[in-house]
Design a protein with these regions (language model features):
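Short acidic-hydrophobic, aromatic-tinged amphipathic segments that line or gate anion-handling sites
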Residues: 1-2, 68-71, 156-164
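Active-site regions of enzymes building and remodeling cell-envelope glycoconjugates
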Residues: 62-73, 102, 172-174, 188-194, ...
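Boundary-proximal intrinsically disordered activation/regulatory segments immediately upstream
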Residues: 1-54, 137-138
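Structured adenosyl-cofactor binding patch, chiefly the S-adenosyl-L-methionine
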Residues: 124-126, 137-154, 206-242
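Alpha-helix capping/helix-boundary segments
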Residues: 33-35, 55-56, 74, 137-138, ...
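Glycine/small-residue-rich loop that forms an oxyanion/phosphate-binding "nest" at active or ligand-binding sites
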Residues: 67-92
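Active-site/ligand-binding-proximal alpha/beta "capping" segment
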Residues: 176-224
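RNA substrate-binding interface of SAM-dependent RNA methyltransferases
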Residues: 95-181
Length: 242
Protein backbone atom coordinates (compact mmCIF):
# COMPACT_ATOMS: atom_id res chain seq x y z
CA UNK A 1 0.00 0.00 0.00
CA UNK A 2 1.04 3.58 -0.62
CA UNK A 3 -0.51 7.04 -0.24
CA UNK A 4 -2.81 8.15 -3.05
CA UNK A 5 -0.97 10.63 -5.27
CA UNK A 6 -2.39 14.01 -6.28
CA UNK A 7 -2.59 12.78 -9.87
CA UNK A 8 -4.68 9.78 -8.89
CA UNK A 9 -6.89 11.98 -6.73
CA UNK A 10 -7.57 14.17 -9.75
CA UNK A 11 -8.22 11.11 -11.91
CA UNK A 12 -10.78 9.71 -9.45
CA UNK A 13 -12.53 13.08 -9.30
CA UNK A 14 -12.72 13.05 -13.10
CA UNK A 15 -14.80 9.86 -12.92
CA UNK A 16 -17.61 11.89 -11.38
CA UNK A 17 -18.41 12.90 -14.96
CA UNK A 18 -20.32 10.43 -17.13
CA UNK A 19 -18.23 11.16 -20.22
CA UNK A 20 -15.06 10.15 -18.37
CA UNK A 21 -16.66 7.02 -16.90
CA UNK A 22 -17.78 6.06 -20.40
CA UNK A 23 -14.39 6.83 -21.92
CA UNK A 24 -12.51 4.64 -19.46
CA UNK A 25 -15.29 2.10 -18.89
CA UNK A 26 -14.96 2.49 -15.12
CA UNK A 27 -17.19 3.42 -12.20
CA UNK A 28 -16.73 4.40 -8.56
CA UNK A 29 -18.37 2.81 -5.52
CA UNK A 30 -18.32 4.54 -2.13
CA UNK A 31 -19.04 3.37 1.39
CA UNK A 32 -17.79 0.50 3.50
CA UNK A 33 -20.73 -1.86 2.97
CA UNK A 34 -20.94 -1.38 -0.80
CA UNK A 35 -17.18 -1.62 -1.30
CA UNK A 36 -16.82 -4.79 0.79
CA UNK A 37 -19.73 -6.38 -1.08
CA UNK A 38 -18.02 -5.50 -4.34
CA UNK A 39 -14.82 -7.18 -3.17
CA UNK A 40 -16.87 -10.27 -2.40
CA UNK A 41 -18.90 -10.61 -5.61
CA UNK A 42 -17.21 -8.34 -8.16
CA UNK A 43 -13.50 -8.59 -7.33
CA UNK A 44 -12.47 -9.72 -10.81
CA UNK A 45 -13.37 -6.21 -12.05
CA UNK A 46 -11.53 -4.28 -9.32
CA UNK A 47 -9.21 -1.54 -10.55
CA UNK A 48 -8.16 0.08 -7.26
CA UNK A 49 -9.17 0.76 -3.66
CA UNK A 50 -8.85 3.96 -1.65
CA UNK A 51 -9.08 3.77 2.12
CA UNK A 52 -8.49 5.64 5.34
CA UNK A 53 -5.65 4.02 7.26
CA UNK A 54 -8.10 3.23 10.06
CA UNK A 55 -10.16 1.08 7.67
CA UNK A 56 -7.34 -0.80 5.93
CA UNK A 57 -7.46 -3.70 8.39
CA UNK A 58 -11.00 -4.51 7.22
CA UNK A 59 -9.88 -4.89 3.60
CA UNK A 60 -8.96 -8.51 2.75
CA UNK A 61 -5.20 -8.92 2.46
CA UNK A 62 -5.27 -10.02 -1.20
CA UNK A 63 -6.43 -6.54 -2.21
CA UNK A 64 -3.72 -4.60 -0.39
CA UNK A 65 -1.55 -4.39 -3.53
CA UNK A 66 -4.19 -2.22 -5.22
CA UNK A 67 -5.10 -0.24 -2.09
CA UNK A 68 -4.07 3.40 -1.64
CA UNK A 69 -4.38 5.31 1.62
CA UNK A 70 -5.77 8.81 2.09
CA UNK A 71 -6.45 11.24 4.88
CA UNK A 72 -10.03 12.10 5.82
CA UNK A 73 -9.63 15.47 4.10
CA UNK A 74 -8.33 13.89 0.90
CA UNK A 75 -11.21 11.40 0.87
CA UNK A 76 -13.66 14.26 1.26
CA UNK A 77 -12.12 15.99 -1.75
CA UNK A 78 -12.52 13.00 -4.07
CA UNK A 79 -15.87 11.83 -2.72
CA UNK A 80 -19.29 12.45 -4.23
CA UNK A 81 -20.96 11.95 -0.86
CA UNK A 82 -21.90 14.86 1.39
CA UNK A 83 -20.52 12.86 4.31
CA UNK A 84 -17.72 10.62 2.99
CA UNK A 85 -17.35 7.11 4.34
CA UNK A 86 -14.06 5.37 4.97
CA UNK A 87 -13.26 3.96 1.54
CA UNK A 88 -14.09 3.87 -2.14
CA UNK A 89 -13.35 1.51 -4.99
CA UNK A 90 -12.92 1.90 -8.73
CA UNK A 91 -14.27 -1.00 -10.79
CA UNK A 92 -14.08 -1.86 -14.48
CA UNK A 93 -17.42 -2.22 -16.17
CA UNK A 94 -18.20 -5.81 -17.15
CA UNK A 95 -19.03 -6.69 -20.74
CA UNK A 96 -22.35 -8.52 -20.80
CA UNK A 97 -24.40 -9.87 -23.67
CA UNK A 98 -28.02 -8.89 -24.15
CA UNK A 99 -30.16 -11.84 -23.07
CA UNK A 100 -32.99 -13.04 -25.28
CA UNK A 101 -36.22 -14.74 -24.26
CA UNK A 102 -35.75 -13.76 -20.62
CA UNK A 103 -37.98 -11.53 -18.49
CA UNK A 104 -36.68 -8.00 -18.93
CA UNK A 105 -37.40 -4.56 -17.49
CA UNK A 106 -37.27 -1.78 -20.09
CA UNK A 107 -36.83 1.81 -18.88
CA UNK A 108 -37.92 4.59 -21.21
CA UNK A 109 -36.41 7.89 -20.14
CA UNK A 110 -36.16 7.39 -16.37
CA UNK A 111 -34.34 10.45 -15.02
CA UNK A 112 -34.19 10.22 -11.24
CA UNK A 113 -31.12 8.36 -9.91
CA UNK A 114 -33.05 7.22 -6.83
CA UNK A 115 -35.74 5.63 -8.99
CA UNK A 116 -33.15 3.93 -11.16
CA UNK A 117 -31.30 2.55 -8.15
CA UNK A 118 -34.51 1.30 -6.55
CA UNK A 119 -35.57 -0.42 -9.79
CA UNK A 120 -32.17 -2.13 -9.93
CA UNK A 121 -32.71 -3.30 -6.36
CA UNK A 122 -36.19 -4.57 -7.26
CA UNK A 123 -34.77 -6.44 -10.24
CA UNK A 124 -32.25 -8.07 -7.92
CA UNK A 125 -35.00 -9.03 -5.44
CA UNK A 126 -37.33 -10.52 -8.06
CA UNK A 127 -34.60 -12.34 -9.99
CA UNK A 128 -34.76 -10.21 -13.14
CA UNK A 129 -31.55 -10.76 -15.10
CA UNK A 130 -31.25 -7.50 -17.05
CA UNK A 131 -32.47 -3.97 -17.65
CA UNK A 132 -32.68 -2.44 -21.11
CA UNK A 133 -32.78 1.36 -21.18
CA UNK A 134 -33.31 4.18 -23.64
CA UNK A 135 -30.19 6.20 -24.27
CA UNK A 136 -31.63 9.16 -22.36
CA UNK A 137 -32.26 7.14 -19.20
CA UNK A 138 -30.07 8.15 -16.25
CA UNK A 139 -26.62 6.53 -16.18
CA UNK A 140 -26.68 3.38 -14.05
CA UNK A 141 -23.14 4.24 -12.88
CA UNK A 142 -24.23 7.62 -11.53
CA UNK A 143 -23.03 7.66 -7.88
CA UNK A 144 -26.57 8.23 -6.58
CA UNK A 145 -27.85 5.26 -8.58
CA UNK A 146 -25.11 3.04 -7.19
CA UNK A 147 -25.86 4.14 -3.62
CA UNK A 148 -29.59 3.48 -3.90
CA UNK A 149 -29.12 0.16 -5.72
CA UNK A 150 -27.67 -1.32 -2.50
CA UNK A 151 -25.27 -3.61 -4.35
CA UNK A 152 -27.63 -4.59 -7.17
CA UNK A 153 -25.37 -2.78 -9.65
CA UNK A 154 -22.93 -5.67 -9.27
CA UNK A 155 -25.49 -8.30 -10.29
CA UNK A 156 -27.92 -6.75 -12.77
CA UNK A 157 -26.56 -5.97 -16.25
CA UNK A 158 -27.88 -2.72 -17.74
CA UNK A 159 -27.93 -2.14 -21.49
CA UNK A 160 -28.49 1.22 -23.21
CA UNK A 161 -29.87 1.08 -26.73
CA UNK A 162 -32.41 2.41 -29.20
CA UNK A 163 -35.63 1.04 -27.71
CA UNK A 164 -37.66 1.14 -30.92
CA UNK A 165 -35.12 -1.05 -32.68
CA UNK A 166 -34.79 -3.38 -29.68
CA UNK A 167 -38.54 -3.83 -29.24
CA UNK A 168 -39.11 -4.30 -32.98
CA UNK A 169 -36.55 -7.09 -33.06
CA UNK A 170 -37.70 -9.06 -30.01
CA UNK A 171 -40.78 -11.30 -30.24
CA UNK A 172 -41.24 -11.31 -26.46
CA UNK A 173 -44.66 -10.13 -25.19
CA UNK A 174 -44.49 -6.48 -24.15
CA UNK A 175 -46.43 -4.83 -21.31
CA UNK A 176 -46.25 -1.07 -20.78
CA UNK A 177 -47.32 0.66 -17.57
CA UNK A 178 -49.71 3.55 -18.19
CA UNK A 179 -52.69 5.29 -16.62
CA UNK A 180 -55.33 4.04 -19.05
CA UNK A 181 -54.39 0.42 -19.61
CA UNK A 182 -55.96 -2.88 -18.68
CA UNK A 183 -56.09 -3.53 -14.90
CA UNK A 184 -52.85 -5.35 -14.21
CA UNK A 185 -54.42 -8.21 -12.26
CA UNK A 186 -56.62 -9.13 -15.24
CA UNK A 187 -53.64 -9.93 -17.43
CA UNK A 188 -51.85 -13.27 -17.82
CA UNK A 189 -48.09 -12.76 -17.91
CA UNK A 190 -45.64 -15.16 -19.60
CA UNK A 191 -42.29 -15.96 -18.02
CA UNK A 192 -40.39 -14.18 -20.79
CA UNK A 193 -42.36 -10.93 -20.82
CA UNK A 194 -41.02 -7.41 -21.08
CA UNK A 195 -42.18 -4.76 -18.59
CA UNK A 196 -41.85 -1.21 -19.94
CA UNK A 197 -41.74 1.67 -17.45
CA UNK A 198 -41.81 5.26 -18.65
CA UNK A 199 -40.45 8.66 -17.71
CA UNK A 200 -41.50 10.06 -14.33
CA UNK A 201 -43.41 12.99 -15.85
CA UNK A 202 -44.29 11.95 -19.40
CA UNK A 203 -44.70 8.19 -19.16
CA UNK A 204 -43.92 5.80 -22.00
CA UNK A 205 -43.29 7.51 -25.35
CA UNK A 206 -45.95 7.05 -28.08
CA UNK A 207 -43.53 5.28 -30.42
CA UNK A 208 -42.80 2.77 -27.66
CA UNK A 209 -46.50 2.32 -26.84
CA UNK A 210 -47.09 1.51 -30.51
CA UNK A 211 -44.86 -1.56 -30.05
CA UNK A 212 -46.59 -2.70 -26.86
CA UNK A 213 -48.86 -5.75 -26.82
CA UNK A 214 -50.85 -4.87 -23.70
CA UNK A 215 -50.83 -1.57 -21.78
CA UNK A 216 -51.45 -2.23 -18.09
CA UNK A 217 -52.50 0.01 -15.24
CA UNK A 218 -52.62 -0.16 -11.46
CA UNK A 219 -56.18 0.87 -10.54
CA UNK A 220 -56.54 3.96 -8.38
CA UNK A 221 -58.91 3.97 -5.40
CA UNK A 222 -57.87 7.27 -3.84
CA UNK A 223 -57.09 10.80 -4.97
CA UNK A 224 -53.35 10.62 -5.79
CA UNK A 225 -52.57 11.78 -9.31
CA UNK A 226 -49.97 9.10 -9.98
CA UNK A 227 -47.61 6.54 -8.48
CA UNK A 228 -43.85 6.87 -8.19
CA UNK A 229 -42.33 4.84 -11.03
CA UNK A 230 -40.28 2.65 -8.68
CA UNK A 231 -43.36 1.93 -6.55
CA UNK A 232 -45.35 1.04 -9.66
CA UNK A 233 -42.53 -1.22 -10.83
CA UNK A 234 -42.58 -3.08 -7.50
CA UNK A 235 -46.34 -3.65 -7.68
CA UNK A 236 -46.20 -4.92 -11.25
CA UNK A 237 -43.19 -7.17 -10.68
CA UNK A 238 -44.91 -8.80 -7.71
CA UNK A 239 -47.78 -9.77 -10.03
CA UNK A 240 -45.79 -10.64 -13.14
CA UNK A 241 -43.15 -12.83 -11.50
CA UNK A 242 -44.76 -15.74 -9.70
Amino acid sequence: MEPLSKAKQKWIRSLQLKKNRDLESLFVVEGEKSVLEGLSVFAVHLEMLVSLETFVEQIPHQFHTVTFTVTAKELEQISELKTPNKCLAVFRRPETALLTDRFTIVLDGIQDPGNMGTILRLADWFGVKQLVCSKDTVDCYNPKVIQSSMGAIYRIPVHYTDLVTYLEQTPQPKFAAMLNGKPYKEVVYPENGILIMGNEGKGVRPEILDLTDIPVTIPRFGEAESLNVATATAILLAEMIQ
